[in-house]
Amino acid sequence: MRFVSAGALAACLWAVVVAAPQNPPPPPPPPVPTVTPTATVTPLPAVTTPTVTPTPAATPDPTPTVSFDDWLTAVRAEAVTRGIKEATLDLAFTGLTPDPVIIARDRTQPELTQSLDDYVTARLNPKTLARAAEVARTDKDVIERVRATYGIPGPIMVAIWGLESNFGQFTGVRPVITALATLAYDGRRPALFRSELFQALAIVDKGLVNLPEFNGSWAGAIGQPQFMPSSFLKYAVDFDGDGKIDIWTSPADVLGSMANYLKTAGWTEGARWGREVKISKTVMAKIEKAVPMRSTGCRARREMTQARPVSEWRDLGVLEMDGTKLPAASLSASLVRGQKRNFLVYQNYQAIIEYNCSNAYAVSVGLIADKIARETPAK
């Protein structure tokens, strides 16, 4: 959800990506945070390892048991024990109040309120695909340098870039500290967002951004890759070698940081993410009896089946989209089901899920990347 501005036309083409369809167009991008040169960034101890846009299972709308002021007092005390300076906390917490708009957005994420089929259809329209292909051609040199370093295909990086921030057109206008404090206090995922709040405070405390300019998404995601603060501290890189990590305005740092994340998440160079498959009602009934769903992990992981060799899916009657048989391969694959569309997904798909735990999102990334690869083949 962040990137180098490509003009009003790109914003129009990708508007559906950066907001739910019923919302009005996003406001103009906020001032770009000032990034201070840094060689090595060490994150504070984290409670969890979140995805870029966290979507773990949530409890049903719990009510906070203490006042926000009392809660913030406790958070401040813990922040001090984590090494955050009092002066930073004074700046960050003075006048801080929860934002009800952020709570509303958390309840209406398109990945959660739209079906997989509808979400994918909305993103894979001709205009968005054309824009992605254009970016793949325009930025091919830096994309190739990043690919050579990390082994992540250019089309995958471009697809994520577009879905996250419309190639930098919209990186968020919500104050990050306010967003994270609101979500941590809300109580649906307190450990996750409390941890991210401390990481965000560390970013400010280290002087990596100026607090008045530290804006992001409603979930506290920052920069063109829409990294959560902990991900910024762990995975963001100075790929252009100018002495600072800048995921707000440097395409090289943006792409390098995304690629570093995916490589760390287990992306295997040269392997596919998955494929769309054809499944009849009779075959689906057999699958439901023979292949259990996963029972652990974030919501997206629990919405896919356990892994089976492609050869086993072949034996169950799963077909290629043209009606031919699947290869008799030992490659491990899980089934992701939509209302009408179905996908066998491989290990590289799991790396995309690590970036954003939503099957609708991950399938969209894969399909957009496939389209880009067909239109801009490697030389």
Name each model feature, range by range:
Residues 69-89, 127-163, 173, 182-193:
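Export/targeting segments at the very N-terminus of extracytoplasmic proteins
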Residues 14, 18-73, 77, 86-90, ...:
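Compositionally biased, proline/threonine/alanine/serine-rich low-complexity intrinsically disordered stretches
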Residues 79, 88-98, 151-168, 200-205, ...:
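Short, functionally critical alpha-helical segments immediately adjacent to catalytic or ligand/cofactor-binding
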Residues 92-145:
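Signal peptide-directed extracytoplasmic domains
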Residues 177-184, 197, 222-237, 258:
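Substrate-binding/active-site groove segments that recognize
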Residues 239-247:
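Acidic, glycine-anchored loop motifs typical of Ca2+
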Residues 6-16:
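Bacterial N-terminal signal peptides
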Residues 280-379:
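C-terminal soluble interaction/assembly domains
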